[in-house]
Amino acid sequence: MGKREDIKKILVIGSGPIVIGQAAEFDYAGTQACQALKEEGYEVILVNSNPATIMTDTTMADRVYIEPLTLEFVSRIIRMERPDGILPTLGGQTGLNMAVELDQAGILKEYNVELLGTKLDSIQQAEDRDLFRALMKELNEPVPDSEIIHTLEEAYTFVERVGYPIIVRPAYTLGGTGGGLVYNEEDLVEIVTSGLKYSPVTQCLVEKSIAGFKEIEYEVMRDGKDHAIVVCNMENIDPVGVHTGDSIVVAPSQTLSDREYQMLRNSSLKIIRALGIEGGCNVQFALDPDSFQYYIIEVNPRVSRSSALASKATGYPIAKIAAKIAVGYTLDELLNPITQTTYASFEPALDYVVSKIPRWPFDKFEAANRSLGTQMKATGEVMAIGRNLEESLLKAVRSLEAGVYHLDQPDVNDLDKESLEKKLTKPDDERLFALGEAIRRGYTIEELWALTKIDRFFLRSFARIIQLETQLKENVGDLELLKEAKERGFSDMIIADLWGTSEQEVYELRMNHGLSPVYKMVDTCAAEFASATPYFYGTYEEENESERTDKKSILVLGSGPIRIGQGIEFDYATVHTVWAIKEAGYEAIIVNNNPETVSTDFSTSDKLYFEPLTVEDVMHIVNLEQPEGVIVQFGGQTAINLASELAARGVKIIGTALEDMDRAEDRDKFEQTLVELNIPQPLGDTATSIEEARQIAERIGYPVLVRPSYVLGGRAMEIVYKEEELLNYMAHAVKVNPKHPVLIDRYLTGKELEVDAISDGENVYIPGIMEHIERAGVHSGDSIAVYPPQTVPESLKQKLIERTIELARGLRIVGLLNIQFVWHKDDVYVLEVNPRSSRTVPFLSKVTGVPMANVATKVMLGKTLPQLGYETGYHPEAKEVSVKVPVFSFAKLRRVDITLGPEMKSTGEVMGRDKTLEKALYKGLIASGMSIPTHGSVLFTIADKDKQEAISLAKRFYQIGFSILATEGTAHILHEEGIPVTTVNKISDEKPHLLDVIRAGDAQFVINTLTRGKQPARDGFRIRRESVENGVVCLTSLDTAEALLRVLESITFSAESMPVMQ
């Protein structure tokens, strides 16, 4: 068939900001698609709202629009660009929904735009529950017995027919709010009632529960000529009942008999053919472990999180092939880019085991409900490759960077019998470690199977790990056991721990006996054909397949799994570094373990090592490759934390020297530097005990900001206003890290300003200054950032520029630098300095046109800024105003307080850019998912300290036609100011009260500022959660509310009566 010649211009829709359930895998898919289409000579137009992506780089498409992914804006782009075709299946759920909306609004028909790849009716057949069930019945494919109900009686009738347990899924609620598993009548009444209450159409789907069945996924591809293949099949270690995005997954499946494998394979191919999908598709099965009965759980007619995992697990580039199928190619016309000799119609074969473990945000959200169910909670994931299940699994565990290196977690080990068993029966993020502990306590495989329904094959594998632990403990220094432990994925650190010696000694013992890993290639064909790709994993075997070349090389450390505080921004910088290293004539080698990202695409670097980011794993690669040095500036805190350990082992760290990094990160050394440079910072001191903390706070005066030293994303930071709050914090936070003291600073109120700079040690170039809308005290990652600054006078800008240059020179920075200042009264004080790439690099690079990561890398490799065309100073400001708006995933995490503070909570970001601040903000807020009604009611519940400030906001809302609602205290003050206000009952008063108003949809905006004291039971917390769960915009910072008001004022007309004639 070949490619279609009748289309010239194609619009690709991205997936927008990173939220729980839709992470970096779509940047990887979108980037691949754009490259594939450009390769074929098509004109590519890309629209996406997320600036932290590689796909929104101007080199990726012919034209890039960073605009909100809404009907209004995408239609406008279609009108301007008039594309021939649109490719929505690479933009996740967002892209699919957009395509459906464009079609329903008649836009596609009006402008004659063809949907490429999977057709609309196929999308709807897979996505709509009723249509999907009908199709499965037609194909004779079993789906779980289910029914749609509107009353509790109907639920009883259903249970009488199928029996317990059942699953309740409310209609039109986000992420299964109100639903759950029902085991008995008591559950039934509670869950169905709550489900019907939460569903806006009072409707639930009840289905026979198949929790406990094996969950198996097939990743399939089909082309327009009806060729279909299975790229990869995967097995969830956690049985059905836990969302696949929250499950530990292995590929290929480990426990299926050949008959089961073929049965499910045939079924998945039959389904993709019946749906007429052209491209990639993911089919999820539930399989009864005791018979050949299976059910279809769901089908995703698009590239998904699983396809990113399948691509990295097999080396088969699903998104790239899907894009080519969309423009008419067939599988047997496309070469497999890994082997470059076989065709894409050849099913991949694996001679290794891949494990994926999710990374959850519970370290940031202590109060969140940690249990895992049908609603996804993980922010990211890690993947590891090994030659056996144990090796693969243990490598994945130590890739998580959650302070665990083995099936061993101190908190879990201290649990009593009852709590431990509860963790096994009701899964949460620590179940894997609970299994390890249970085996240590002597639980049998059968007992564990009864508690968890995890297949006995996996349980035996965990038991093998624990058994080896015991043998190591009893035989200190045994070389045979050491060899076996390394083959099974044990790290030196754990072996040293069991032997009571140091990691270094275990390492030396191995080196003396020639025990070090070899690197095997991922080649899609189990080494059947020769392969051209440089994609490797380490394992303890005989033959090494990774050859060192003659070219000088540089090793780049990636940033690991996506989590709050360390998002896709760092992967963006990593990819740019790799490209710059290649441009500078070196070989670029990357080490990373996140299957979702562009950096782990085998075509990004010259060599890719898919390995954990630990000292041991990185050192093995350094020993083999002998690079000129290692770059750690772009991998976030992950890479920075490895720097000193690597340097201690003689590795050259490229860029800012270690002792200079330490001068920026270590409190006392940093203060000394600031004093020498005569740059002011807020008063502060370091406390090592509770008593000392009390004295410091008393001396510098409340409010104070307290935090542990060395953190990313402000973990465990808090602003405290009085002594009892301080003592309460110290009791919880000093435990964060006893070796590291706690920092206590005077909390200065004022505007926060952020500066990114590039320095070669002498020359300093400043691409841009950003002004934060939220005052200091809200984490910079959770603030709306504006570029260029709108309210900063020229004289203050000069001061910022001078201080940034002095700091960069004073700290001898080589590479990137990020500084946060607070503008208090008439001066700017330094809050913190990060001697590395920061999360604003992608945003600033895009809005200023300065390729920051690229320039910084070349500087680190020895060029000076003037040689690259940059003199010391400030980059000319752009005329357009751009805003970076944070995006949160609160709807997916129940019990989490949404108040903004010094601890970061956002998972992603979007950008809005226009001629004025108001227009840019409108785009940014809309793109972040906020709905902005132009009339209705605003509910104020304000803390005493903010009441004066809230008056002017209420007045302005009233002037543009909003009704004002408020609780008694606030209402009284507004009334005195002559603002008409309706008083609403507090939660403790009789109904209807505050929460009823929010539930009934009678408030369009809720503005609620925090009353001190953090226990979630407080009214404020309930108000904020109720807003999130009912999709009402809730603002916890008056600054954000003011920004929203400016937008509303600019899009609504004022209605002022005429002045009275004199």
Curated annotation (Swiss-Prot):
ATP-grasp domain residues are 133-327, 671-861
Which residues does the annotation say bind Mg(2+) 2? 298, 300
**Residues at which Mg(2+) 1 binds:** 284, 298
Q: Mind telling me which residue stretches traverse the membrane in this protein?
A: none
The record ties this protein, via InterPro entries, to: ATP-grasp (IPR011761), ATP_grasp_subdomain_1 (IPR013815), CarbamoylP_synth_lsu (IPR006275), CarbamoylP_synth_lsu_oligo (IPR005480), CarbamoylP_synth_lsu_oligo_sf (IPR036897), CbamoylP_synth_lsu-like_ATP-bd (IPR005479), CbamoylP_synth_lsu_CPSase_dom (IPR005483), MGS-like_dom (IPR011607)
User: Per UniProt, where does Mn(2+) 1 bind?
Assistant: 284, 298
Q: Enumerate the residue ranges of region (Oligomerization domain).
A: 402-546
Q: Which residues bind Mg(2+) 3?
A: 820, 832
Q: Specify which residues bind ATP 2 according to the UniProt entry for this protein.
A: 707, 746, 748, 752, 777-780, 820, 832
Q: Which CDD domains match?
A: MGS_CPS_II
Which residues, if any, are the signal sequence?
none
Question: Locate the MGS-like domain: which residues?
Answer: 930-1062
Record's family?
Answer: Belongs to the CarB family.
NCBIfam families, per the entry = CPSaseII_lrg, PRK05294.1, PRK12815.1
According to the UniProt entry, the note on domains is:
The large subunit is composed of 2 ATP-grasp domains that are involved in binding the 2 ATP molecules needed for carbamoyl phosphate synthesis. The N-terminal ATP-grasp domain (referred to as the carboxyphosphate synthetic component) catalyzes the ATP-dependent phosphorylation of hydrogencarbonate to carboxyphosphate and the subsequent nucleophilic attack by ammonia to form a carbamate intermediate.
On assembly, the entry states: Composed of two chains; the small (or glutamine) chain promotes the hydrolysis of glutamine to ammonia, which is used by the large (or ammonia) chain to synthesize carbamoyl phosphate. Tetramer of heterodimers (alpha,beta)4.
**What name does the UniProt record give this protein?**
Carbamoyl phosphate synthase pyrimidine-specific large chain
Q: Which species does the entry assign this protein to?
A: Halalkalibacterium halodurans (strain ATCC BAA-125 / DSM 18197 / FERM 7344 / JCM 9153 / C-125)
